[in-house]
């Protein structure tokens, strides 16, 4: 869990099939999760008398709320892809044949964006889970001061004025 937690770049999970226990935990650690219609999820640990040790008990309540998370942890029930999407476990469900293409296109759209701002968005979004709103807004202001000085910001503003797509460089 620490490796993905420390990554400042967006991390996208692509789930095509069954994700149980550590497999589900690894997907939950990612920033976004895209699943095929055939995907199924289960924490599974209760079935073998274990406590989730890979982040399920940390990430799941943040995505689905404490009561639903406890239900899934205590029962080990499987959640089908569409229900996982409805609950917020996955961001999007697509046909199995489209999974790789859809996920690749999403990753490309994010990678083509202003990378300094995207990394800061990730940081402040996760930090907001531990902060009060006033502290969060102060943090966002300090990050805003940094990104306003980037070439990507200047390019974004210029592209907006010229009514064209921006060409970000990550600087």
Located regions from the model:
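Crotonase-fold acyl-CoA enzyme core
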Residues: 2-118, 145, 149-158, 164, ...
């Amino acid at each position: 869990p620490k490796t993905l937690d420390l990554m400042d770049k967006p991390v996208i999970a692509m789930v095509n099939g069954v994700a149980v226990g550590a497999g589900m935990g690894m997907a939950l650690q990612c920033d976004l999760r895209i699943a095929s219609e055939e995907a199924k999820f289960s924490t599974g640990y209760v079935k073998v008398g274990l406590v989730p040790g890979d982040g399920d008990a940390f990430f799941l309540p943040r995505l689905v709320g404490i009561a639903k998370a406890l239900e899934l942890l205590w029962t080990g029930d499987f959640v089908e892809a569409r229900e996982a999407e409805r609950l917020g476990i996955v961001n999007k469900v697509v046909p199995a044949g489209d999974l790789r293409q859809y996920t690749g296109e999403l990753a490309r759209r994010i990678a083509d964006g202003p990378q300094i701002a995207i990394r800061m968005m990730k940081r402040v979004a996760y930090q907001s889970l531990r902060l009060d709103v006033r502290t969060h807004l102060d943090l966002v202001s300090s990050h805003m001061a940094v990104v306003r000085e980037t070439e990507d910001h200047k390019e974004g503003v210029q592209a907006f004025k010229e009514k064209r797509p921006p060409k970000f460089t990550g600087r």
